[in-house]
């Protein structure tokens, strides 16, 4: 499986519009890994090779999109990070154009678009938030148990529900975000629980599911999911960071 990013926020508080919809990350990235069914160690040489040349084939393009998102996640330079996400989006769009009948291109486009939204204003962010959903659903239509797309949809629903009431109303009424009315906590739970079921070894699924349980005040479920995340073996390059987040959030859970 490609590597994923934890897509939801560690902090527990209602979101303003400017703080929401930064969710293309699956998934939600891990620093450099990308290839299906590969361990972290096995992925590193392939990632380096992919980054060293301009991608041309479908597989090379979605892999390059994954690498660019992964590299951008913890990039501190705003301009460099924005450029990486723009590159990822361009690669993913080319991948989908070459092979619209495969789920990976759509998944990585949802991931890249969500990250690209980070640098944009509210109206553009809402527009891309809608595309995140569209591309994740396109991936699920082609591969109904695609864990990355399941993760994206789970976090998409959760992020909309985390918007404060005013922000959600503004997005729906004035910014073209009527589709946000479809979001629900029950769908957030359903998608993330299925992602964990399909891919139980992936820490980020359990971490983002724990955050949803936490926000729903399902404290014991949240505690169990956080503990499972902490106990997970490294699968993606940034799992050590996510494990630290899970450990701290578990400590603060009441």
Regions found by a protein language model. Give the residues of each.
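N-terminal secretory signal peptides that target proteins for export/translocation
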Residues: 1-14
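Bacterial N-terminal signal peptides
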Residues: 19-33
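N-terminal leader/linker segments that initiate helical-solenoid repeat arrays
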Residues: 32-78
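Short coil/linker segments at helix-helix boundaries
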Residues: 66-101, 108-145, 155-195, 234-241
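TPR/TPR-like (Sel1-like) alpha-helical repeat modules
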Residues: 133, 219-237
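Long, repeat-rich segments with strong aromatic
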Residues: 199-210, 214-217, 235
């Amino acid at each position: 499986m490609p590597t994923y990013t934890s897509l939801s926020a560690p902090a527990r508080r209602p979101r303003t519009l400017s703080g929401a919809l930064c969710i293309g990350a699956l998934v939600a990235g891990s620093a450099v890994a990308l290839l299906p069914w590969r361990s972290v160690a096995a992925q590193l040489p392939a990632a380096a090779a992919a980054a060293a040349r301009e991608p041309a084939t479908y597989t090379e393009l979605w892999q390059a999109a994954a690498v660019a998102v992964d590299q951008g996640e913890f990039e501190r330079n705003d301009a460099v990070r924005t450029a990486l996400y723009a590159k990822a989006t361009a690669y993913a769009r080319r991948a989908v154009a070459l092979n619209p009948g495969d789920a990976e291109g759509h998944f990585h486009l949802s991931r890249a678009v969500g990250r690209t939204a980070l640098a944009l204003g509210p109206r553009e962010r809402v527009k891309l938030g809608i595309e995140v959903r569209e591309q994740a659903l396109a991936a699920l239509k082609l591969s109904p148990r695609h864990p990355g797309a399941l993760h994206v949809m789970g976090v998409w629903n959760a992020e909309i529900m985390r918007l404060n009431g005013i922000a959600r109303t503004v997005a729906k009424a004035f910014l073209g975000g009527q589709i946000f009315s479809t979001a629900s906590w029950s769908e957030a739970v359903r998608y993330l629980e299925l992602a964990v079921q399909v891919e139980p070894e992936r820490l980020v699924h359990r971490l983002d599911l724990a955050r949803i349980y936490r926000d729903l005040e399902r404290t014991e479920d949240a505690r169990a999911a956080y503990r499972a995340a902490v106990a997970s073996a490294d699968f993606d390059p940034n799992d050590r960071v996510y494990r630290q987040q899970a450990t701290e959030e578990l400590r603060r859970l009441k």
